[in-house]
Amino acid sequence: APLKGSLYVIKGVYREMKTAHLREGIMQAVFTACACISILAVVLICVFLFANGLPTIGKIGPLKFLLGTTWKPGNDIYGILPMILGSLYVTAGAIIVGVPVGLLTAIYLSRFSTPAIKRVMLPAVQLLAGIPSVVYGFFGMIVLVPAVQAMVKSDFFKTVLHIKGGKGMSLFTASVLLGIMILPTIITVSKTSLDAVPESYYEGSLALGATHERSVFYAVLPAAKSGVLSAVILGIGRAIGETMAVVMVAGNQTWMPKGLFQGLRTMTSNIVIEMGYAADL
């Protein structure tokens, strides 16, 4: 009887192990399939872009296409250098505006603010992340564009800075608006990275005689630099891929960028505006 009981237990354990192994195999297959689908989607997008784009670029000429400074689809002239530079300038401006503000805000929320302030500011930051791009664009048209237009027309700009002929819809306006739009990403990711730094770093710095501020900026912040860098990269991705808000405030001129307060067009804006020409290529 003890032997039969032992055999029954062994069979039960074997059956459970076999079932668990089967479940594990099924879940592994499901996860592998999901990963393959994600990779396949990226591959198909690349294949579609190259299959439809390379013949057209071959007709135009790679150098004329990439380095051409004139964009006139009606005359079969397709030079995208102004849009490439426009995207780079707007993204750089957004990073200059957004990164310092976002990083300092994250440091404040992580190490300096009171719980009461956190309860107010964190939901506000999350709310900024949920606002649609077109709403940001509308805010830029109604608030930022008139403000910049009045600023460039002021006597200070004309007499002191010697800036004349500026416009409200410009590189500056687009950079400021995009800088505001990337704030939630930079603040959230940077704060998470700062909160993840072991408290021993901060306490050790205090034990060596450093002040609270020096401990935060010279011990905690360097330890979180990889997360902060990730936040900046995500902000760059958000800025360089933004379309609707930039279309509404950048002016959308297809010439080479001429100045901080002059209009320009980005790559994403050009795709939206000139979509009608794509069918005839």
Listing of model-derived features with the role each one plays in the protein:
Residues 246-281:
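Interhelical loop and adjacent transmembrane-helix boundary motif
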Residues 127, 131, 186-190, 197, ...:
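Transmembrane alpha-helices
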Residues 14, 18-25, 29, 51-94, ...:
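Periplasmic/extracellular loop-to-transmembrane helix junction in inner-membrane transport proteins
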Residues 83, 87, 123-126, 130, ...:
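Residue-level signal for discrete positions within transmembrane alpha-helices
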Residues 19, 94-125, 146:
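Transmembrane-helix boundary motif in ABC transporter permease subunits
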Residues 59-78, 138-180:
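Membrane-interfacial helix termini and adjacent extracytoplasmic/periplasmic loops
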